Amino acid sequence: MFSSTFRRLAIRPLNRVTMVGAMHDIQVGFLDRCSVFQFTLTCTVLDFQKVAEPQPKSPGSLPSSTRTAPNPNGEEVEKHINKEQYTVRCLGSEAYTEALKNYLDDGCIVRVIGRLKTTEVVDAGKKQPFPCIIVEQGRWSTVSLVHSLRKQRRDWQLQNILTSVATLE
């Protein structure tokens, strides 16, 4: 009984990440025989830490990325705004990468669901791990447009094109 139920369930990847951020440094090319749409995703991370000693109240004395604010418990909390950058590689057919290229521009806010993969890159004679998020066409991964300055909420058009490309193949 369990095996028949198990066969009907779709096996999903264990390594799955969801990121929201601004995209920039867009590149289009080929990796082996697969078409690639690659960009850098910049995510803003807000980190709260308790302040051990009282901080000065003037906002000019603190760096621009650090502010103090009262916590609901009445404690002083220091907020750090950090920016993290991730490389995203969208792999698929040429029609898939062309659709992404036509609808996504620099500065767009996107949601990325994909698989985190680490590759080794040789830099100055040393091998260094290089993490990137892999978005494969039709593999429980997606790139969705959240906000664009030039195109007002055209995510439905992007998703329609991507699904039509998937059904053609």
Swiss-Prot record:
Compartments reported by the entry: Mitochondrion
Listed InterPro entries: NA-bd_OB-fold (IPR012340)
Protein name: Uncharacterized protein Tb927.8.680, mitochondrial
Keyword Transcription part of the UniProt annotation: no
Keywords: Mitochondrion, Transit peptide
Organism whose genome encodes this protein: Trypanosoma brucei brucei (strain 927/4 GUTat10.1)
Keyword field contains Mitochondrion: yes
Biased amino acid composition, Polar residues: 61-71
GO CC terms: cytoplasm; mitochondrion
Targeting presequence: 1-91
Region of interest (Disordered), residue spans: 54-76
Main location: mitochondrion
